Regions:
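Short, acidic, small-residue-rich periplasmic hinge/interaction motif at the N-terminus
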Residues: 39, 45-46, 83, 92-105, ...
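Outer membrane beta-barrel strand-and-loop segments of large Gram-negative receptors
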Residues: 488-492, 536, 627, 633, ...
Length: 852
């Protein structure tokens, strides 16, 4: 027995030695040596690969790096860094090829240092034509401040820039530039001189570019939480002045917040906030957030695990896990899972008045409870074949665990003309039965010659079964059932074509939707069977041109929509309109550091959600019913905006004009058979307009990073055609104060406050409301891969919705509502061997998915 154990031990040691020899590990430190010398040394010291390169071609590129426990391809990739150098690995032949991507005889070289003589890493060097400042090439300095950039002209203009430092221009007539010293760019804030530091964001011709890596933003646990602390983000999750954004992660459309919860903030390199999206986005999109993750090399297993818990009146908890296995040839296999137990409570008091044949008053104390257990899982594969081609595929499934439960309970007193008419307790329970939903996404992104192709296709299939039961105590119970089936097929193609001047992008997008809804009830209204079919096909083109400091972007989208609406098996032509519309977008930008200005026009078009196009009347309580309106038309929005930015100060003025705006409205349901009952449905307002100013400031003083945003808006709505007499034009304001303190030993404190002062606008009056949130976090382990955070929201319990609304015909409502916002909890997340996802697919037909 001992002999057997001894033999097995020797065999294990021998196999380990063989494995280590087969996959030799590189541990080495380089200090300002040429890339050619480093490659030659690595080639001579190992036998796993043969490294092929041209010595003279790479001699100008110098390496300063510390390599620890890396295989040879990963070590070479780290040495290459941001240089215009490409590495090709041929594992079958055990060969590595390293070559410069720009075949020129000249390399512009130099070293960048700061005011204290320390090297400046990752500074941007742009090589310009001295005659017209057109961009000829560019690069980034390495860890020792050294840069080497291929160029061809005899004389060039070098522009060296780094956030927080003054930009340096150097006219170069020889390859060796020498040492360039950069000076901080200082500014004064209330008498305090603040020396140049990295700005939280920079301006682009489409919006803002926010750096996440290396800033306090990377210490927020999840990407979802991190996004709430970006510039221009308001407490309601919208971009100030631009509504709810569409979100992409590495070109893949985000389907829900659970995807953002699974992505760690420290895996994000940068975020682009697009407030002027082109026509390649859907006609309904008014703003976009594009997340770019940190690209890491490596093979084998990687993953992350996280959990969250919140406790208020009800509790919330979630866990998620992601695993990825990467092969040497760039192929990834991944699986993700997410599980949540979400419970919420809303309490509300209302005093409703309805003027019909009599004056009815309903005084209610209401409680809404929501209980849901849910899982999300997907399996996928993607293959980055080479630098020019990548493909991928993802299957996603999600479902409820048990019934999703929504309970509405209220105590109501009803008075007619000042006299007591009725009182009682009412309870309704709506159960959503578990139904497995499926979706499939596939994509191809590639370059064919000078043409770039981005293609994606989607299939989505979802069923739901809702069952409502309840009523008022002592009276006949009511019940209803709604069975819904949704199916979507969509595809999208975007092509970037080579043109002599500027950039041309064009493509097409198509989607088909088949939706059925079967509604049955116990006698309080009428049964119906509705089938809605929609086919949308669009073509679009964008052209952009940059001349010096001036940029012009123009785009046009032609959208064709065909609808078929069937009620109880019979087509209704009036409810089946066809549309053929043009969606134009235009922006002109001027950038001259530190100023950026832009003028833009944007047209968007929003189709009503399918759920409000139903004519079914559903039951809420004895005196409350709900319905939709199948005659609603798409809403068209026109927006003109002027934006200016100076360093960390942002300002924007917006004018908006809207057509066919759909609103919910309340009126008498049936004054004869249901006296005093209120019906909520949807109507169209022909036109509205609004004026808005958005301000944002993101200064940094030492450890204190500020991010303050404010909205000022005035609305000019005319609801007279709906029978609503009130039309106020009061100022609406919204303030967000986000403060992040970076503390020693990987601690971070965030204090965020928001306040919405008293508002009197359109047909409502809202009282002042606000909240105060805290987050204290710490990163653990040597690589800071473990993050633990204590979080508290709405500490002062001030986030009430309170006011008076006249949103109906002869209708008034005085209300006070609280959504269980005060909670305390914690987040824990851990990642290992983080080889970031290469999945690049986006989603076609996304607006139709949102409507479903």
């Amino acid at each position: 027995m001992r002999h057997t154990i001894y033999t097995l031990t020797l065999m294990a040691c021998w196999l380990a030695i063989v494995e280590c020899q087969a996959q030799q590990i590189v541990n080495r430190k380089y200090d300002n040596v040429t890339l050619s010398e480093a490659l030659l040394q690595l080639n001579n010291e190992q036998t796993e690969y043969v490294v092929n390169f041209l010595y003279n071609e790479l001699e100008d590129f110098r390496v300063t790096a510390t390599i620890k426990n890396k295989r040879l391809p990963d070590a070479i990739q780290q040495m290459i860094g941001f240089y215009p150098v490409r590495m090709t690995v041929k594992p079958d032949d055990r060969e590595i090829y390293v070559e410069c991507t720009h075949k020129t005889d000249r390399h512009l070289t130099g070293t960048i240092i700061d005011e204290q003589g320390q090297p400046v890493a990752y500074a941007n060097i742009a090589v310009l034509n001295p005659s017209d400042s057109t961009l000829l090439g560019g690069g980034v300095s390495n860890e020792s401040g050294y840069f080497a950039i291929p160029y061809e002209q005899a004389k060039v203009l070098a522009r060296i820039s780094y956030v927080g430092y003054k930009t340096v221009y150097r006219l170069c007539d020889k390859a060796e530039v020498g040492t360039i010293r950069m000076q901080p760019d200082n500014y004064t804030l209330k008498g305090v001189t603040v020396k140049g530091q990295r700005l939280l964001y920079t301006s682009t011709d489409r919006g803002l570019q926010v750096s996440i890596q290396g800033t306090p933003l990377e210490q927020f646990g999840s990407a979802n939480e991190m996004l709430t602390h970006l510039p221009l983000m308001m407490s309601n999750g919208e971009i100030a002045g631009h509504g709810k954004p569409e979100i992409y992660i590495n070109n893949k459309k985000v389907r829900g917040e659970d995807e953002l919860e699974r992505l760690r903030a420290d895996e994000v390199k940068s975020v682009e906030i697009i407030t002027q999206p082109g026509t390649e986005y859907d006609a309904a999109v008014s703003s976009v957030i594009r997340i770019k993750t940190v690209r890491r090399t490596g093979e084998g297993w990687s993953g992350n695990f996280s959990g969250a818990y919140r406790q208020g009146h009800e509790h919330y908890e979630s866990v998620n896990a992601a695993l990825n296995y990467r092969l040497r040839n760039g192929m990834d296999f991944f699986a993700r899972g997410y599980l949540t137990d979400n419970n919420t409570q809303t309490v509300k008091t209302t005093d409703e008045q309805l003027q019909a044949s009599s004056i009815w008053n309903h005084r209610k104390e209401e409680e809404y409870k929501y209980h849901m257990k849910y899982y999300f899982a997907d399996l996928g594969w993607n293959w980055e074949i080479n630098d020019h081609h990548s493909i991928g595929f993802t299957y996603t499934a999600n479902n409820y665990i048990g019934d999703r439960k929504y309970i509405c309970a209220n105590d109501m007193q009803t008075m007619q003309d000042g006299m007591m008419w009725d009182e009682g307790h009412s309870t309704t329970t709506t159960l959503t039965k578990p139904k497995l939903n499926h979706s499939i996404n596939a994509y191809y992104i590639g370059e064919i010659g000078k043409w770039k192709v981005d293609f994606s296709a989607d299939y989505y299939n979802a069923h739901s079964q809702n069952e409502m039961s309840g009523g008022t105590e002592g009276e006949t119970p009511v019940s209803s059932s709604t069975a819904t089936k949704n199916q979507l097929i969509a595809e999208k193609l975007v092509i970037t074509a080579p043109v002599p001047i500027g950039k041309l992008t064009f493509g097409e997008e198509a989607s088909t939707v088949d939706r059925t809804s079967d509604f049955t009830q116990s006698g309080f209204s009428a049964d119906n069977h509705i089938r809605q079919q929609t086919a949308i096909w669009s073509v679009f083109a964008n052209y952009s041109l940059k001349v010096g400091s001036l940029s012009v972007n123009a785009g046009l989208r032609w959208q064709n929509e065909h609808n078929r609406y069937e009620l109880d098996g019979v087509r209704n032509d009036e409810m089946s309109p066809n549309y053929h519309v043009l969606i134009p977008r235009l922006s002109i930008s001027y950038q001259h550091s530190p100023w950026t200005h832009s003028l833009s026009y944007q047209c968007t078009r929003n189709n009503p959600p399918y759920s409000i196009l139903s004519s079914a009347v559903t039951y809420t309580s004895k005196y409350e019913y709900n319905s939709g309106n199948p005659f609603l038309q798409p809403q068209t929005n026109h927006r003109v905006a002027w934006k200016s930015q100076w360093k960390w100060i942002y300002a924007e003025a917006i004018y908006g004009y809207q057509e066919n705006v759909y609103h919910s409205i309340r009126s008498a349901y049936d004054d004869v058979n249901h006296p005093g009952a209120i019906l909520t449905d949807f109507r169209t307002v022909p036109k509205t307009q609004y004026y808005m100013i958005v301000l944002n400031a993101t200064p940094k003083i030492g450890i204190w990073q500020m991010n303050y945003s404010v909205e000022f808006a005035v609305q000019d709505h005319d609801y007279g055609e709906l029978g609503i007499a009130h039309n106020w034009h009061g100022l609406m304001t919204d303030f967000t104060f986000d403060n992040t303190f970076t503390l020693p030993h990987a601690w971070m404190l965030n204090v965020t406050g928001s306040i919405t002062p008293y508002q009197k606008s359109a047909y409502w009056i809202n009282k002042t409301t606000g909240s105060l949130d805290l987050r204290l976090s710490k990163q653990f382990l040597r690589d800071k891969s473990l993050n633990v955070a204590l979080v508290a929201s709405d500490i002062l319990r001030t986030k009430y919705d309170e006011g008076t609304a006249y949103g109906g015909i002869g209708y008034r409502n005085i209300f006070r509502l609280y959504r269980d916002a005060r909670r305390i909890g914690f987040n824990v997340s851990w990642r290992f061997n983080a080889t970031k996802s290469r999945y690049k697919g986006s989603h076609a037909g996304q607006s139709e998915r949102n409507r479903l």
